[in-house]
Curated annotation (Swiss-Prot):
Residues 101-113 have a biased composition (Basic and acidic residues). It is found in: Cytoplasm; Nucleus. Keywords: Activator, Chromatin regulator, Coiled coil, Cytoplasm, DNA damage, DNA repair, Nucleus, Transcription, Transcription regulation. One of its GO terms (molecular function) is histone binding. Residues 383-419 form a coiled coil. The lineage of its organism: Eukaryota, Fungi, Dikarya, Basidiomycota, Ustilaginomycotina. Belongs to the YAF9 family. This is Protein AF-9 homolog. Residues 195-209 have a biased composition (Pro residues). Residues 80-100, 246-257 have a biased composition (Low complexity). One of its GO terms (cellular component) is cytoplasm. The coiled-coil domain is required for assembly into the NuA4 complex.
Amino acid sequence: MSNKRVRGLAIHRPILYGSTSTPLTPAEKLAAPPDHTHKWTVAVRSAASLPLPSLSAISGASDGSSFEPGSEVGAINAASGMATPSSSSAAGGSAATVSTRGRDQEHDYHKMVGNKDDISHFIKRVQFKLHETYSQPTRNVDKFPFHITETGWGEFEIQIKIFFVAEANEKPLTLFHHLKLHPWLQNVAAVETEPPAPPAPSLPAPLPPADMSATNSSVEQDGQASTSANGTKQEAGPDSMEVDPTASSTTEQQTSTDAKVESTPVAEPAVATTEPLKPALPPVVHSWQYDEIVFPEPMEAFYDILSTHPPTPLPVVSALAFADPAAYRSYLYAKADAAKGNSTGPPPIPPHPLHTPTGYLFDALSLEAQNAEGERLEMARIAAIKDLEKGREQLIKAEKALKDARNRIAALNNAALASCTAVSGTVPPAS
């Protein structure tokens, strides 16, 4: 192995490090400690990702289903409403359209960011240092994929140490990531776990027993009326009483109407109980940091390894990062409407919201997103330069005003000293 370095050259490799967290499902809660609320995965991955699954694939709905423009919340709500009728058919339809990162029927969100390329050709080991409350808080992962999955209830800082292969002859790289379990978006975090209840109808006052019996008799009469309407004629028994047909028909119509009105409040709770509950939103929190590991003047053998394993280039536009480009386009339309002030609702959410650990939202991992980030940094640099120039001008004006004030004070002191000398003819003692 050659110990020579390639002089005057640097090579870099993009990586993603961060975490993905989801609330525990009822099945996962059985195996987790009672106080744990979330399942999270911390990992070091390649920046390139497979296309994210479409919203229709995640929800199990048909490809023609429509959701709220630019919102993943609509897809999740559709998933909660369509998961119960036929889970087998929904799973079959989803498996045909979802990518390999979501190949499981439950759509494992923990595999949906990065990890398209195998990075074990230049990373030998990744060490994760968890909170001390976990058993064996220092975890070493010696093979691809480099990730740790655990459950917990709190957020804490995780130390990530990356060890490179022997050919690199480089020291380990230490990174820090703050585990994120709860969303940054306040409008999404405020969504309740249950659907909004309809306004409660005004309940009538309790009826006396006589009215209850009248209601029961009206229901029976209504049943007799419907039977006679179908053409079935009932014969009166020997103990039956003859009633005026005109009066009986009027009474039947009135009592049947009352029964329908009184039965309306009773039917509403039945409909409300059959409606499936919506899950807590959002079900996934992506907190990832894009970074590039730079190797200045690498070893010749290591440079050959990196050259023979080039990283997969990122998509040109953000829409190509999703399996359903229409979902991203609808988000852009909703975002443009919100910027113009046409929308009065909450700000639109990308189909798969990704955040940096600082809470900054970016749409996808693409060259378009990189250019947008570069433009944002350039605008911030220009704004900082403008503020610096403005502050410099204010400082120059303040220094000039201070100099003028000092000159004025000195002139006043000299004038006062001259007047005192002229009056007394002696110099006043220095104070």
